[in-house]
């Protein structure tokens, strides 16, 4: 092994960048200093004496070291670079074909005949097979044609050469079968792009050359004579390396920060700016002069790149450099091209590529050579070199997001004059690595470029401003608090004033009046018969998932993904595409199988005839494959870009499509990869084959054609399958986008919930399953004839869109920043929208039941028929592999064909192998793996800190596992409750981790060891608690099974009821209700008491209220919305409660118009919920004790004959024989859990006093009196409250005293030095009008419930005075404990 390492260490670094023949040939040029054994020279009889063996001329010959041949260096193939090389051997001794880098082409070429005729005429050339080869260490300028016979001679000594030739021929066959024109050597590969360095060899200059479209790791040394035609590039190299290049005549008297406005396009720009672009340049210059960091947010296609280049060029004129531009990898070449067009005088370096390529850039493009010079000596003879900052060679560095993170150690030390971030909305997440890295870079000025600064909410816009100016926009929480009510005109104006200096936003319709219009048409298409068949089959096979109550959202997501695939094309499903050898028949089936493709075919044929060019966007790479098959059969020239195409290749394909007289008819693109920062204005038709969930992605795609440079009207066609999830998706996404820009203050990024998923999936299903005679199935079929297609494609009918989706954006927040007024929805409309949202949430609990019944009615018969057919097929042994798997059986069905493009762009496909592809963005759930078949096993532990994983489970996933285990137990070890909660994990992974976890908790407990026996840390896990909970839930599961298997038997035997008398039936609550309660624990999980209470299907709310002799209350949707907005402080007087019959239902706010009535309803509703939860919790705890005791009897084999040895006698003094008539004694432990009163001492008063105001002392005295009353009446008050009994006379008297003290405090606080007596009377509450009743229902004890001694009507007046004192009650943290009154 060591010898292998040593051999690898001494290998040459000059490896082929790529091999056309995919060879792994590792032969390299021998080192120059290699010594050869001295052997006797071979005497060749045909050697020419003192002459070149090739041309016959003498002088400057190179002699072979092993034979008598001699050659000129230029006559050799390949030419010899160094004629002075020692130990050189001629091609006859050593085959030069060992130095082949690539085989590029092969053809029959003429060569001179070896047979000389008798006449003096020129010998007749003969055609022989020759190969075009590129040599190692030489550029494409020095490629040579080598006859096949030379290869045949070399096969003897180089057996691998034969394999390389065979591989080349196989690849040539594939090229010949394609429609693309084959080019062996592209002209760009022999065109000098940049010269990096210079050296002198044997009196001749040589230059290190980078060629166009080749990366920096393919640079070659060329003699000056070989590149003599590229004098401009040679001169540019000399200028760049000249230290006087930047010595411009700058007016040093003028402060460079003084704003200088440009009235017309400046001379240093090699083009003409539009008026709005000139305005943008002035805005950027002004912002730079004021040191104000800004966002240039012009609409896509208005030339933000050009305006930015104009700014950097203006700064370059004043010797202000260097600048950093960060952009998506796919747009870097476009940036480079725009710099070359508009500001060719600037030295722009593009920094990206492999590690080797970046090393070349850093070595030759970053810094000038050191210029040693003497400085004023602080010490004798001290010499210093220029700082690296002063030696920076480039003016602008273009780089990608990945390089910012990957090479921050190189880029961060540089002090940048200006930093520009293209597609700046990527910085909306402050937790992203890009945001964190860029904040550490030093720059004098920062600019963000984005066409969509407000995609989701104001919080994201704030994060962009925080990146620009962390001082002015420091705290998101403060920003949210300051602008929480953004609909108020005053706040809108203030926000506008704050942001206006930082944001400029223009749209096409305002600044480009002469731009051709665009029109979007939504074309509704019917599914084909095959699509309908598979669409219905997906529903039928997943009947059990659809009817499952509370089914996992991941399952619905996967069903939706399968349906989306069917809408695109049924061939998207695995195994559906038939194998047809006849190409015409295969094409016919391809069209007939898909309604969309049939319409697309009709449109494309006419678009081709009319000379239009088309962009087709889709979400799926598989769909791109099908569209590619379609175009290939039609023999149409096309280009394709998806997430697998790298940055350089993308630009090549874009250039081919945009080239003058290009024969490319259409461009196939994935929406995410082909919708960002590229210019395809030569196309005038856009077809959105299937829509993106994010409408902004489709807007980006449309803007590729409708932008600067477009000369034709642009038609956009969006294909939607009628009555399918596509139609519903489009409706929801458009509605959400409109709402986003109407109610800016309410914007929050929300993932689609389960109700919306079911609504989307359900859409159109009834019509799909309806027969032709049913009413639901009578809607007419959509048919597009030739006349309809002609009308759709008639551009003379096109007018500019009145209100498109992107125009709606401008009706919202961003419209303010083109110097106009804000437009917002009014408060009433906002409140109505919020009420609709609350009402929708209130129906969510019933949604599962409605969903189940809907699908059961629609699919039950069909599912049963489907099962019968499968069983029948199985019985006949004809059952084939299912083409459509059930989502229930395979929770990952259909996710493998999703487009692999990233959420923002294709950046995962970096050209650097070291730069790993980024994960899935922001807003989209990562797709789960199907398993680890044929892969290496997951390591037990890996990573450190936050990245620490156990069997691939991170910290969050491990916590979710434990939480789920404590809630549902291990069940039957099928982990059914775990799979939907660990969406990133497969069942196999969960099962593997679960087995490991159970092994861990089964180990002998060692409290002194922080790890388990295998080294996995315990992470604070309380093993005893986990074991007890698992055992309890097993008992619950067994009890549920016992109840189901023995419906006539009691839940517990009589001896258990005698042991726990509280289990006996009450006046309302019976044994069957305990059965419901036990099942509810398994359904909702242990400890989820509120979920059990809220479960409408259980129907226990009214039962518990009747058992507790407490009225059942229901609230309206508006009141529930108000309830959620409460801070929990109460605000109503319980004494105002009216008499109700036990068990009656109170409907809140039915006839009440006053605010107090609504507050009362909310208070009683909250109190009812608290009591319900407390009852459920106590009841489950009692059932738990009974099950534990029953199991203990079985364990000890006592059978109820005697008491359990380890069990203390059960003492239940707090629970009577019946549920509803229990009496709870108040002990000292219960009182100790109440909040403590803390009287104010005289020393504290003196220490805090700031003046001699006697009123302050009086308030402290009143406060101490209140504390005394609370302490004296604590026990009696709590006793009355917890047992729902009327308070004693003493408590009522103390209550009236407390009321009097409160009035005195309010009187003191309402008096100020500058208030008149009349104003004092207005602001003081009229306490004499408060009627205090002494009934049990109307009065609560001092330490029970919520008591507010202020009168509702007087609260506003009191608040307007100097202050107020409210006496409130806080709920105890533990629900089983009573409540205490707290004085604020």
Swiss-Prot record:
Biased composition (Acidic residues): 893-912
Modified-residue entries (Phosphoserine), positions: 23
Impact noted for substituting residue 301 to R: In chk2-2; hypersensitivity to cytokinins
Class of enzymatic activity (EC top level): hydrolase
Biased composition (Basic and acidic residues): 1316-1341, 1367-1384
GO biological process terms, semicolon-separated: cell division; chromatin remodeling; cytokinin-activated signaling pathway; intracellular water homeostasis; negative regulation of abscisic acid-activated signaling pathway; negative regulation of DNA-templated transcription; regulation of lateral root development; response to auxin
Motif annotated as DEAH box, chain positions: 422-425
Tree of life domain: Eukaryota
Domain Helicase C-terminal: 599-760
Family (UniProt): Belongs to the SNF2/RAD54 helicase family.
Oligomeric and partner information: Interacts with TAF12B.
Descriptive protein name: CHD3-type chromatin-remodeling factor PICKLE
């Amino acid at each position: 092994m060591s010898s292998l390492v040593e051999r690898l260490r001494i290998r040459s670094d000059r490896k082929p960048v790529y091999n056309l023949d995919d060879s792994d040939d590792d032969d390299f040029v021998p080192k120059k200093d290699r010594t050869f054994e001295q052997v006797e020279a071979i005497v060749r009889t045909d050697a020419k004496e003192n002459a070149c063996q090739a041309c016959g001329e003498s002088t400057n010959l190179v002699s072979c070291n092993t034979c008598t041949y001699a050659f000129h260096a230029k006559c050799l193939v390949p030419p010899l670079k160094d004629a002075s090389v020692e130990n050189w051997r001629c091609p006859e001794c050593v085959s030069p074909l060992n130095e082949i880098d690539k085989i590029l082409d092969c053809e029959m070429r003429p060569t001179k005949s070896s047979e000389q005729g008798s006449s003096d005429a020129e010998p007749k050339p003969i055609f022989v097979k020759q190969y075009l080869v590129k040599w190692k260490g030489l550029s494409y300028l020095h490629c040579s044609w080598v006859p096949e016979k030379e290869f045949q001679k070399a096969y003897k000594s180089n057996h691998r050469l034969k394999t390389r030739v065979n591989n080349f021929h196989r690849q040539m066959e594939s090229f010949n079968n394609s429609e693309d024109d084959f080019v062996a050597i592209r002209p760009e590969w022999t065109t000098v792009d940049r010269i990096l360095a210079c050296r002198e060899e044997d009196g001749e200059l040589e230059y290190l050359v980078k060629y166009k479209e080749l990366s920096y790791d393919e640079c070659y040394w060329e003699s000056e004579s070989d590149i003599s035609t590229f004098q401009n590039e040679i001169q540019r190299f000399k200028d760049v390396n000249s230290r006087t290049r930047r010595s411009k005549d700058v007016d040093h008297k003028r402060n460079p920060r003084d704003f200088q406005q440009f009235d017309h396009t400046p001379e240093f720009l090699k083009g003409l700016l539009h008026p709005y672009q000139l305005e943008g340049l002035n805005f950027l210059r002004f912002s730079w002069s004021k040191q104000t960091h800004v966002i240039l947010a012009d609409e896509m296609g208005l030339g933000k790149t050009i305006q930015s280049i104009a700014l950097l060029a203006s700064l370059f004129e004043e010797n202000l450099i260097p600048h950093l531009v960060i952009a998506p990898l796919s747009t870097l070449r476009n940036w480079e091209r725009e710099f070359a067009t508009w500001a060719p005088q600037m030295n722009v370096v593009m920094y990206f590529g492999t590690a080797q390529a970046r090393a070349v850039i850093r070595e030759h493009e970053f810094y000038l050579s050191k210029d040693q010079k003497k400085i004023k000596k602080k010490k004798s003879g001290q010499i210093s070199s220029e700082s690296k900052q002063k030696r920076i060679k480039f003016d602008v560095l273009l780089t990608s997001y990945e390089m910012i993170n990957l090479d921050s150690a190189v880029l961060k030390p540089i002090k940048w004059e200006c930093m520009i971030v293209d597609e700046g909305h990527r910085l909306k997440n402050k937790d992203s690595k890009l945001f964190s890295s860029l904040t550490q870079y030093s720059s004098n000025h920062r600019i963000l470029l984005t066409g969509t600064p407000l995609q989701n909410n104001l919080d994201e816009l704030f994060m962009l401003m925080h990146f620009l100016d962390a001082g002015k926009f420091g705290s998101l929480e403060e920003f949210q608090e300051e602008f929480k009510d953004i609909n108020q005109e005053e706040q809108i104006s203030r926000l506008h004033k704050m942001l206006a200096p930082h944001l400029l936003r223009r749209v096409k319709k305002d600044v480009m009046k002469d731009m051709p219009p665009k029109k979007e048409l939504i074309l509704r298409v019917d599914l084909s018969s095959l699509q309908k068949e598979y669409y219905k089959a997906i529903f039928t096979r997943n009947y059990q998932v659809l009817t499952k109550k509370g089914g996992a959202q991941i399952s619905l997501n996967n069903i939706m993904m399968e349906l989306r695939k069917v809408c695109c094309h049924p061939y998207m499903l695995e195994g559906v595409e038939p194998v047809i050898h006849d190409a015409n028949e295969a094409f016919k089936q391809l069209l007939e199988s898909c309604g969309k493709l049939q319409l697309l075919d009709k449109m494309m044929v006419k678009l081709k005839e009319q000379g239009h060019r088309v962009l087709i966007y889709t979400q799926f790479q598989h769909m791109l494959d099908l569209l590619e098959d379609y175009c290939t059969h039609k023999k149409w020239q096309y280009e394709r870009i998806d997430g697998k195409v790298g940055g350089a290749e993308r630009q090549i394909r874009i250039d081919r499509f945009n080239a003058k007289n290009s024969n490319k008819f259409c461009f196939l693109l994935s929406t995410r990869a082909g919708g960002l920062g590229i210019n395809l204005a030569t196309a005038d038709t856009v077809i959105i084959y299937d829509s993106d969930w994010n409408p902004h992605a489709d807007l980006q795609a449309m803007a590729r054609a409708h932008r600067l440079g477009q000369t034709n009207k642009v038609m956009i066609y969006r294909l939607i399958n009628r009555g399918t999830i596509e139609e519903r998706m489009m409706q929801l996404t458009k509605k959400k986008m409109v709402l986003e820009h109407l109610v800016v203050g309410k914007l929050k990024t929300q993932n689609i919930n389960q109700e919306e998923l079911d609504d989307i999936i359900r859409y159109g299903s009834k019509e799909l399953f309806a027969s032709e005679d049913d009413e639901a199935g009578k809607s007419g079929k959509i048919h597009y004839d030739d006349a309809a297609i002609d009308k759709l494609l008639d551009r003379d009918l096109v007018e500019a869109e009145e209100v498109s989706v992107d125009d709606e954006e401008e009706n919202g927040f961003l419209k303010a920043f083109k110097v106009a007024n804000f437009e917002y929805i009014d408060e009433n409309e906002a409140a109505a929208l919020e009420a609709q949202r609350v009402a929708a949430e209130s129906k969510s609990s019933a949604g599962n039941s409605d969903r189940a019944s809907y699908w059961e009615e629609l699919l039950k018969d069909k599912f049963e028929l489907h099962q019968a057919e499968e069983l029948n097929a199985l019985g006949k042994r004809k059952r084939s592999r299912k083409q459509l798997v059930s989502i229930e059986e395979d929770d990952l069905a259909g996710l493998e064909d999703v487009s692999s493009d990233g959420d923002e762009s294709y950046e995962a496909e970096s050209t650097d192998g070291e730069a790993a592809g980024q994960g899935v963005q922001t807003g989209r759930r990562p797709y789960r793996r199907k398993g680890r078949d044929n892969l290496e096993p997951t390591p037990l532990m890996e990573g450190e800190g936050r990245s620490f994983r156990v069997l691939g489970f991170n910290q969050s996933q491990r916590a979710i596992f434990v939480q789920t285990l404590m809630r549902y137990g291990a069940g039957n070890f099928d982990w059914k409750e775990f799979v939907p909660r660990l969406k990133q994990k497969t069942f196999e992974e969960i099962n593997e981790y679960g087995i490991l976890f159970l092994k861990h908790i089964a180990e002998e407990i060692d409290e002194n060891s922080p790890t388990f026996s295998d080294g996995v840390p315990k992470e604070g896990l309380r093993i005893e608690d986990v074991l007890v909970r698992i055992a309890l839930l097993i008992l619950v599961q067994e009890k549920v099974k016992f109840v189901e298997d023995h419906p006539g038997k009691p839940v517990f035997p009589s001896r258990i009821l005698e042991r726990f008398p509280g289990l006996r039936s009450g006046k309302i609550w019976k044994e069957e209700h305990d059965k419901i309660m036990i099942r509810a624990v398994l359904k909702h999980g242990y400890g989820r008491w509120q979920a059990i209470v809220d479960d409408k299907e259980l129907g226990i709310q009214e039962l518990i209220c009747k058992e507790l002799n407490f009225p059942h209350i229901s609230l309206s949707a508006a009141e529930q919305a108000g309830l959620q907005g409460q801070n929990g402080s109460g605000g109503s007087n319980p004494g105002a409660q009216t008499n109700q019959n036990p068990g009656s239902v109170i409907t809140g706010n039915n006839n009440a118009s006053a605010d107090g009535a609504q507050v009362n309803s909310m208070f009683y509703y909250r109190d009812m919920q608290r009591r319900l939860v407390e009852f459920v919790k106590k009841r489950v705890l009692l059932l738990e004790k009974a099950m534990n005791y029953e199991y203990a009897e079985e364990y000890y084999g006592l059978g109820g004959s005697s008491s359990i040895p380890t069990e203390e006698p059960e003492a239940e003094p707090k629970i009577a024989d019946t549920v509803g008539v229990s009496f709870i004694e108040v002990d000292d432990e219960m009182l100790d859990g109440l909040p403590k009163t803390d009287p104010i001492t005289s020393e504290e008063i003196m220490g805090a006093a700031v003046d001699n105001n006697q009123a302050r002392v009086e308030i402290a005295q009143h406060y101490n009196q209140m504390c005394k009353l609370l302490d004296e009446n604590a026990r009696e008050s709590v006793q009355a409250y917890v047992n729902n009994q009327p308070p004693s006379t003493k408590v009522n008297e103390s209550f009236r005293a407390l009321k009097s003290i409160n009035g005195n405090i309010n009187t003191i606080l309402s008096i100020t030095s500058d208030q008149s007596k009349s104003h004092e009377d207005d602001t003081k509450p009229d306490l004499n009008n408060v009627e205090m009743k002494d009934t049990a229902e109307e009065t609560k004890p001092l330490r029970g419930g919520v008591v507010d001694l202020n009168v509702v009507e007087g609260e506003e007046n009191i608040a307007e005075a100097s202050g107020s004192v409210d006496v409130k009650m806080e709920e105890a943290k533990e629900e089983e404990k009573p409540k205490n009154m707290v004085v604020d």
